[in-house]
């Protein structure tokens, strides 16, 4: 019996170590302990798969334009996604505020942050009008909470270098093709509205009322054939709402 004791002890120690290691792996696995964590990991992976340089040519085009037509500093920068990019009359509508339209593609908030130095900070704007986050929810599957957190990061970057710049967040506007995401849009708006209320020089522009009927239904006639982007009627309703907010 004495001859086999060391071997038995060794086997017992190996077995115990194996159980401990496996237990730690599965106990620490989000999939095993929290089903919702699996969804969070999946969303994070999709963000990681977004090429932050996919709009490099669009941003470069802005820089080429600036070289030919240097904009005045202290202006109002409109930055965000395709809602601004498709608004071809934006700079003319807000010419008296020195509007600079820096909307690009179907960008997300992380992409706006990525290019913030080149599309916002370099202009040293007096105001920044921000519209992004809808693609984060509709395309990346982000939650309203995540969108709010990312907007706070953007504010931190801008105010870190330009503390006297006013930042205006235009409320997330749900499109007909994204009605299934309406609850996350509402949650994001509620969180960002509260953040704007308590943060100096950060303001919330609510365009939701002009986009809906009295009974709450979305005015689908304000959107183009793709049922995603606004048409001229939609932009026309935004102009007085934005102008009123910027005048305060």
Give names to the regions the model predicted.
Residues 117, 121, 133, 156-163, ...:
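Sec-exported extracytoplasmic/periplasmic mature domains
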Residues 147-170, 187, 191-202:
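Charged, glycine-enriched surface loops/patches
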Residues 19-35:
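Signal peptide processing junction and immediate N-terminal pro/mature segment
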Residues 174-248:
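Catalytic His-Asp segment of secreted/periplasmic serine-dependent ester chemistry enzymes
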Residues 31-58, 72, 198, 236-248:
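Conserved catalytic region of serine esterases and O-acyltransferases that act on ester linkages
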Residues 1-11:
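Bacterial N-terminal signal peptides that target proteins for export
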Residues 44-153, 176-186, 190:
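Conserved SGNH/GDSL esterase-like catalytic core that processes O-acyl groups on lipids
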Residues 9-21:
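Bacterial N-terminal signal peptides
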